[in-house]
A protein has these predicted regions:
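Pre-Walker A (Motif I) flank of P-loop NTPase domains
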Residues: 2-11, 97
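Domain-scale detector for complete catalytic domains at protein termini or as standalone homologs
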Residues: 1-6, 65-75, 83-84, 88-92, ...
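Small-molecule kinase domains that catalyze NTP-dependent phosphoryl transfer to phosphate-bearing small molecules
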Residues: 59-66, 139-184
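RNA pseudouridine synthases
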Residues: 93, 109-112
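Short beta-strand-centered segment that lines the nucleotide-binding/catalytic pocket of NTP-utilizing
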Residues: 30-41
Length: 195
């Protein structure tokens, strides 16, 4: 396998997590997503529940926000500690074994490696709303809010911790529209690209 590591960044509702999991199964490689939260918690000293709820947040900006945010004795925010633990774990996983890593700025964290395929999966708006209402059993209005909130958190976190813009095609090796291609074809394209 020319590319050992596959990172998948995705819009909420795009099916990126499902696609990544299927690719990992078909290639017989490890799959990392929410299952690394325990490792991040251990390294950062925070609870897994806190990591789960706050992993995509960014440090607050502004003097007032800085003054009232949680920081350690070195001045690092809690969000910075989580990000640093996450970064170190992703670097360790990439050294350890071939794998698929979902989100967590892994594309940026591993940008200096030649054996990484960075994928961004997006989806047409109507299809995204349809998927979210079906998966989460919510009304369309709630689906739109969930989508906007989740993608905003991802974008803000990514843009804060990297020198890049989340979702910008030039940051990725491959950008796929899952509503145009379907899950199966997205999986096939990714697997073809890692050969």
């Amino acid at each position: 396998m020319a590319k050992r590591i596959i990172t998948i960044s995705r819009e909420f509702g795009s099916g990126g997590r499902f696609i990544g999991e299927e690719v990992a199964k078909k290639l017989g490689i490890a799959y990392y997503d929410k299952n690394i939260i325990g490792q991040i918690a251990e390294k950062s000293g925070l609870s897994p529940e806190y990591i789960q709820e706050n992993a995509e947040l960014s440090p607050k900006k502004g003097l007032f926000a800085y003054a009232f945010s949680g920081r350690d004795i070195t001045g690092k925010s809690v969000e910075d500690m989580v990000y640093e633990a996450q970064r170190n774990i992703i670097l360790e996983l990439a050294e350890k074994e071939p794998c698929v890593i979902i989100g967590r700025n892994a594309d940026y964290i591993l940008k200096d490696r030649d054996d990484v395929l960075n994928v961004f999966i997006h989806v047409d708006m109507l299809e995204k709303i349809k998927r979210i209402t079906g998966l989460y059993n919510v009304k369309e209005k709630e689906a739109v809010k969930m989508m906007a909130d989740t993608d905003k958190r991802r974008r803000t976190n990514y843009n804060f911790y990297t020198d890049q813009n989340w979702g910008k095609a030039s940051n990725y090796t491959l950008c796929l529209n899952s509503s145009q291609l379907g899950y199966d074809r997205c999986e096939m394209i990714i697997m073809e690209c890692v050969k």
